[in-house]
């Protein structure tokens, strides 16, 4: 309902879906085609797990989006809405993102978590064990993530010959630590 309401405020359903598809192209999502704002089944509505992960990582850069998908509960007057994403309660560092189910696609989940300043996104499609699988995927990603220092600040990378200068060569040094994350 919320997705349809937003679409209505953004020029109507067709205009909003066009904006969604334009943004997908801008983000380089070549295997994504939207037909509705809700993510429910549609004749030509499709994407991939990889592209959903890329879209989620992009969307989480928006503070408002991140706040909404990471909210466990919201009370407005006498009504309390509870987020269906169980990882927000069960997984340390969980920050959202999207749960879903249709008969055609089964249980689909896009999740994200942050630890030690690092964000990881996981996606499963048609997965009946999605909550446990995501906890394992996120755990594995955080456990296998390594940061290697390639050089420290001030390291001489090479000497460059200076023709006609006051010195025959000058040292090129790194301004800050260089790290490789993998």
Where are these predicted regions, by residue range?
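Substrate-binding clefts and substrate-entry loops adjacent to catalytic sites
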Residues: 1-8, 33-35
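Generic structural marker for isolated residues within well-ordered, non-membrane alpha-helices
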Residues: 3, 20, 84
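Short alpha-helical scaffolding segments that buttress acidic/His motifs in well-ordered protein cores
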Residues: 6-7, 20, 24, 56, ...
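Conserved short loop/turn motifs at secondary-structure junctions
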Residues: 7-10, 37-43
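Alpha-helical structural elements of signaling/regulatory helical domains
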Residues: 12-15, 129
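Short, charged, amphipathic alpha-helices and their helix-cap/turn boundaries
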Residues: 14-32
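Domain-terminus/edge residues, biased toward the C-terminal soluble/receptor-binding domains
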Residues: 29-33, 41-182
């Amino acid at each position: 309902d919320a997705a349809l309401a937003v679409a209505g405020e953004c020029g109507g359903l067709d205009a909003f879906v066009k904006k969604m598809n334009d943004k997908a192209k801008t983000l380089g999502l070549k295997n994504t085609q939207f037909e509705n704002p809700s993510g429910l089944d549609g004749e030509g509505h499709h994407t991939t797990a990889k592209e959903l992960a890329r879209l989620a990582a992009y969307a989480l850069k928006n503070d408002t989006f991140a706040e909404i998908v990471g909210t466990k509960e919201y009370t407005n007057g006498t009504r309390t809405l509870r987020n269906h994403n169980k990882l927000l309660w069960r997984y340390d560092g969980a920050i959202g993102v999207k749960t879903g189910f249709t008969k055609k696609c089964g249980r689909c989940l896009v999740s994200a978590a942050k630890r030690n300043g690092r964000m990881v996104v996981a996606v499963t499609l048609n997965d009946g064990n999605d909550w446990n699988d995501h906890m394992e995927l996120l755990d594995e990603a955080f456990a296998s993530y390594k940061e290697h220092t390639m050089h420290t600040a001030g390291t001489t990378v090479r000497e460059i010959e200076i023709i006609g200068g006051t010195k025959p060569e000058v040292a090129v040094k790194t301004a800050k630590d260089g790290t490789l994350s993998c």
